């Protein structure tokens, strides 16, 4: 797969072999043509400006980064069959972090107002995390373990873990790395289409060559892994591509295997299914 991706990128670069600009220079020109000025909201109210100055400062960013890391460490300290005291401390810490992140949301709402706050997708994500965390705290307080009609709060406890994703919005370096990761997926659809075509071709060939092999439990060609139907053939090929017991599948598809009772084999040819082509396949 890596070789296919590298070859695809090289073929794309070959289209510009006669261009006087290299790849970085072309990207700079495209960026200059597509760039748009960024609008930054600065409040005119002096009290609102003071709050805005605090929440946009690097010290505030470092503080929230520290709180997120501390929250992550606290989540990592939880373990199976922990004591009641540990559960109590975890609940208290969860409430404390929820209050702090709620305070951050309120300060940003006061600094940017609703329009400016919700104009940033990261702020919308933070807002959803805070709301989910508040619901988690409320349900944790009203949930009674001895009550048969207790509320399931497993889903809302996922918001505790989702706070870690907030780290992606902290720091220019992290955002640059995330943007680079997203941009690397631009060529992925074409590579994925090529891989799908290869799987399709190989699945059809496998159905023709190994589709008559009997499904025997205890072997690699069974009711779950076989070439008798197209979906099963694709799944089996995917298993081979991941390297899971591919050599055993190879041997079970070689010549001399028992034929499926419903296949059209002649009398005395019960063990003539499979082919040596499996070694090349």
Curated annotation (Swiss-Prot):
GO terms for cellular component: L-type voltage-gated calcium channel complex; T-tubule. It holds the Pfam family Ion_trans. GO terms for biological process: calcium ion transmembrane transport; cellular response to caffeine; muscle contraction; release of sequestered calcium ion into cytosol. A motif (Selectivity filter of repeat IV) lies at residues 242-245. The keyword Repeat applies. Gene3D superfamilies: 1.10.287.70, Voltage-gated potassium channels. Chain C (1.20.120.350). Disulfide bonds join 259-273. It catalyses: Ca(2+)(in) = Ca(2+)(out). Channel activity is blocked by dihydropyridines (DHP), phenylalkylamines, and by benzothiazepines. The chain crosses the membrane at residues 59-80, 89-110, 121-140, 153-171, 190-210. IV repeats lie at residues 45-281. Residues 233-251 dip into the membrane without crossing it. Signal peptide: none annotated. It is a multi-pass membrane protein. Residues 1-17, 258-281 are annotated as: Dihydropyridine binding. InterPro entries: Ion_trans_dom (IPR005821), VDCC_alpha-1_subunit (IPR050599), VDCCAlpha1 (IPR002077), Volt_channel_dom_sf (IPR027359). Each of the four internal repeats contains five hydrophobic transmembrane segments (S1, S2, S3, S5, S6) and one positively charged transmembrane segment (S4). S4 segments probably represent the voltage-sensor and are characterized by a series of positively charged amino acids at every third position. The loop between repeats II and III interacts with the ryanodine receptor, and is therefore important for calcium release from the endoplasmic reticulum necessary for muscle contraction. Belongs to the calcium channel alpha-1 subunit (TC 1.A.1.11) family. CACNA1S subfamily. This is Voltage-dependent L-type calcium channel subunit alpha-1S. The gene is CACNA1S.
């Amino acid at each position: 797969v890596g070789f296919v991706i590298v070859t695809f990128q090289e073929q794309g670069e070959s289209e510009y072999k006669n261009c006087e600009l290299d790849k970085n220079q072309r990207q700079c020109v495209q960026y200059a043509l597509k760039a748009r000025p960024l609008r930054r909201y600065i409040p005119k109210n002096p009290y609102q400006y003071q709050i805005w100055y605090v929440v946009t400062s690097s010290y505030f960013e470092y503080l929230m980064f520290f709180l997120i890391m501390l929250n992550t460490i606290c989540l990592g300290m939880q373990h199976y069959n922990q004591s009641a005291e540990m559960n109590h401390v975890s609940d208290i810490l969860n409430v404390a972090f929820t209050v702090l992140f709620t305070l951050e949301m309120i300060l940003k709402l006061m600094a940017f107002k609703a329009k400016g706050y919700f104009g940033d997708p990261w702020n919308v994500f933070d807002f959803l995390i805070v709301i989910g965390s508040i619901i988690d705290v409320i349900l944790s307080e009203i949930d009674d373990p001895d009550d048969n009609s207790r509320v399931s709060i497993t889903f809302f406890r996922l918001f505790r873990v989702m706070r870690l994703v907030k780290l992606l919005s902290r720091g220019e370096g992290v955002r640059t790395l995330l943007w680079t990761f997203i941009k690397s997926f631009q060529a992925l659809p074409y590579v994925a289409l090529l891989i799908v075509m290869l799987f399709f071709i190989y699945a059809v060939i496998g159905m023709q060559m190994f589709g008559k092999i009997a499904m025997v439990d205890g072997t690699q060609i069974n009711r779950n892994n076989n070439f008798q139907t197209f979906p099963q053939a694709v799944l089996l090929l995917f298993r081979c591509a991941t390297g899971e017991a591919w050599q055993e599948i190879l041997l079970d598809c070689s010549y001399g295997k028992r034929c499926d009772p419903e296949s059209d084999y002649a009398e005395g040819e019960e063990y003539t299914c499979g082919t040596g082509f499996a070694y090349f396949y």
